[in-house]
């Protein structure tokens, strides 16, 4: 009979050890995360500050940046604190919080990316009807639905995962609490939960991904009909980069949540999880925003305003 551990805590074994190579990787990862937080925060600031960006497309981008910032903040602070202090314990409640927020934000982002693909389809394929096809009311509904559907998935995963009894040393070979990893420690039959989670993943991952591919397929068909070679190249480059980032994000999610149990590897899980929780949030603002000419112009205007304000403050200080 398997012994059940009565301690309320779990132990996160982490992503890094204390070798020189891993210390360098840890510092590089922190730099990546800080860059990601800064770039996403800047995106939200610009969209809020510049009235020219007060359009559905940029509102969706601001929500994507907010989700990315929250996704990074859910996992990295705890991971960094564990590595620096050596205290790798996490309470059952803390584990539940991570399990809730990861599907909430990851699932919400899946639906939000589908909404953004629809927005691009409406703008490219039906530019004259765009205000009707992508009204503010529809934009807000899609955004709210993305958050609520993600939260529903997160709540179900957190409640179901923490309802199982856990055995052994409560050691989680990961750097944060994730449902597919945690249920491996359960000393109970988890097959019903795993089947339910697979069905959820079909709805949360494959359905939005199919909608995105369909939208970009229609966009590509419209792009090929453009008369201007330069416009065609620009649109194709933009669409291909969007599809590449979307494919990486969904691919990581499908690999983590829909892979057969017999093919699971803790090392692979950690690498893929690090990618979609830390590196994808950095790629999103770079691909969706920084390459956008309107965002670049907004950034120039904002920097110019900051310089002028600083100059005025210096002049006022000198006149005293």
UniProtKB/Swiss-Prot annotation:
<comment type="similarity">
    <text>Belongs to the G-protein coupled receptor 1 family.</text>
</comment>
<feature type="transmembrane region" description="Helical; Name=1">
    <location>
        <begin position="24"/>
        <end position="47"/>
    </location>
</feature>
<feature type="glycosylation site" description="N-linked (GlcNAc...) asparagine">
    <location>
        <position position="17"/>
    </location>
</feature>
<feature type="topological domain" description="Cytoplasmic">
    <location>
        <begin position="48"/>
        <end position="55"/>
    </location>
</feature>
<keyword id="KW-0472">Membrane</keyword>
<dbReference type="GO" id="GO:0005886">
    <property type="term" value="C:plasma membrane"/>
</dbReference>
<keyword id="KW-0716">Sensory transduction</keyword>
<dbReference type="GO" id="GO:0050911">
    <property type="term" value="P:detection of chemical stimulus involved in sensory perception of smell"/>
</dbReference>
<feature type="topological domain" description="Extracellular">
    <location>
        <begin position="258"/>
        <end position="270"/>
    </location>
</feature>
<protein>
    <recommendedName>
        <fullName>Olfactory receptor 2T12</fullName>
    </recommendedName>
</protein>
<keyword id="KW-1015">Disulfide bond</keyword>
<dbReference type="InterPro" id="IPR000276">
    <property type="entry name" value="GPCR_Rhodpsn"/>
</dbReference>
<feature type="topological domain" description="Extracellular">
    <location>
        <begin position="78"/>
        <end position="98"/>
    </location>
</feature>
<keyword id="KW-1003">Cell membrane</keyword>
<feature type="transmembrane region" description="Helical; Name=3">
    <location>
        <begin position="99"/>
        <end position="118"/>
    </location>
</feature>
<dbReference type="InterPro" id="IPR017452">
    <property type="entry name" value="GPCR_Rhodpsn_7TM"/>
</dbReference>
<feature type="topological domain" description="Cytoplasmic">
    <location>
        <begin position="119"/>
        <end position="137"/>
    </location>
</feature>
<keyword id="KW-0552">Olfaction</keyword>
<feature type="transmembrane region" description="Helical; Name=4">
    <location>
        <begin position="138"/>
        <end position="156"/>
    </location>
</feature>
<keyword id="KW-1133">Transmembrane helix</keyword>
<feature type="topological domain" description="Extracellular">
    <location>
        <begin position="1"/>
        <end position="23"/>
    </location>
</feature>
<keyword id="KW-0807">Transducer</keyword>
<keyword id="KW-0812">Transmembrane</keyword>
<dbReference type="GO" id="GO:0004930">
    <property type="term" value="F:G protein-coupled receptor activity"/>
</dbReference>
<feature type="topological domain" description="Cytoplasmic">
    <location>
        <begin position="218"/>
        <end position="234"/>
    </location>
</feature>
<keyword id="KW-0675">Receptor</keyword>
<feature type="topological domain" description="Extracellular">
    <location>
        <begin position="157"/>
        <end position="193"/>
    </location>
</feature>
<feature type="transmembrane region" description="Helical; Name=2">
    <location>
        <begin position="56"/>
        <end position="77"/>
    </location>
</feature>
<dbReference type="Pfam" id="PF13853">
    <property type="entry name" value="7tm_4"/>
</dbReference>
<feature type="transmembrane region" description="Helical; Name=7">
    <location>
        <begin position="271"/>
        <end position="290"/>
    </location>
</feature>
<feature type="topological domain" description="Cytoplasmic">
    <location>
        <begin position="291"/>
        <end position="320"/>
    </location>
</feature>
<feature type="transmembrane region" description="Helical; Name=5">
    <location>
        <begin position="194"/>
        <end position="217"/>
    </location>
</feature>
<dbReference type="GO" id="GO:0004984">
    <property type="term" value="F:olfactory receptor activity"/>
</dbReference>
<feature type="disulfide bond">
    <location>
        <begin position="95"/>
        <end position="187"/>
    </location>
</feature>
<dbReference type="InterPro" id="IPR000725">
    <property type="entry name" value="Olfact_rcpt"/>
</dbReference>
<comment type="function">
    <text>Odorant receptor.</text>
</comment>
<feature type="transmembrane region" description="Helical; Name=6">
    <location>
        <begin position="235"/>
        <end position="257"/>
    </location>
</feature>
<keyword id="KW-0297">G-protein coupled receptor</keyword>
<keyword id="KW-0325">Glycoprotein</keyword>
């Amino acid at each position: 009979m398997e012994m059940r551990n009565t301690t309320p805590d779990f132990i996160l074994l982490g992503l890094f050890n204390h070798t020189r190579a891993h210390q360098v990787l840890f510092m590089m990862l922190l730099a990546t995360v800080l860059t990601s937080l800064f770039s996403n925060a800047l995106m939200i600031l610009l969209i809020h500050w510049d009235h020219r960006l007060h359009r559905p497309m940029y509102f969706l981008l601001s929500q994507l940046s907010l989700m990315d910032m929250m996704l990074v903040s859910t996992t990295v602070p705890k991971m960094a604190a564990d590595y620096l202090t050596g205290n790798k314990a996490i309470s059952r409640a803390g584990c539940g919080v991570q399990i809730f927020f990861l599907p909430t934000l990851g699932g919400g982002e899946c639906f939000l990316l589908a909404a953004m693909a629809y927005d691009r389809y409406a703008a490219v394929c039906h530019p004259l009807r765009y205000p009707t096809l992508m009204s503010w009311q529809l934009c807000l509904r899609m955004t709210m639905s993305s958050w609520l559907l993600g939260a529903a998935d997160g709540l179900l995963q957190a409640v179901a995962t923490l309802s199982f009894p856990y055995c052994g040393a409560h050691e989680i070979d990961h750097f944060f609490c994730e449902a597919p990893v945690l249920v491996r420690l359960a000393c109970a039959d988890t097959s019903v939960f795993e089947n339910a989670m697979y069905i959820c993943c079909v709805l949360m991952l494959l359905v939005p991904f199919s909608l995105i591919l369909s939208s970009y397929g229609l966009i590509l068909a419209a792009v090929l009909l453009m008369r201007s070679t330069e416009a065609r190249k620009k649109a194709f480059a933009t669409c291909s980069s969007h599809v590449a980032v979307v494919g990486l994000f969904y691919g990581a999610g499908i690999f983590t949540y829909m892979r057969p149990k017999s093919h699971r590897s803790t090392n692979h899980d950690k690498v893929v999880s690090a990618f979609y929780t830390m590196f994808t949030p950095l790629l999103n603002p770079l691909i969706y925003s920084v390459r956008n000419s309107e965002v670049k112009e907004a950034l120039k205007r904002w920097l110019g305003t900051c310089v002028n304000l600083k100059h005025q403050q210096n002049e006022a200080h000198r006149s005293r």
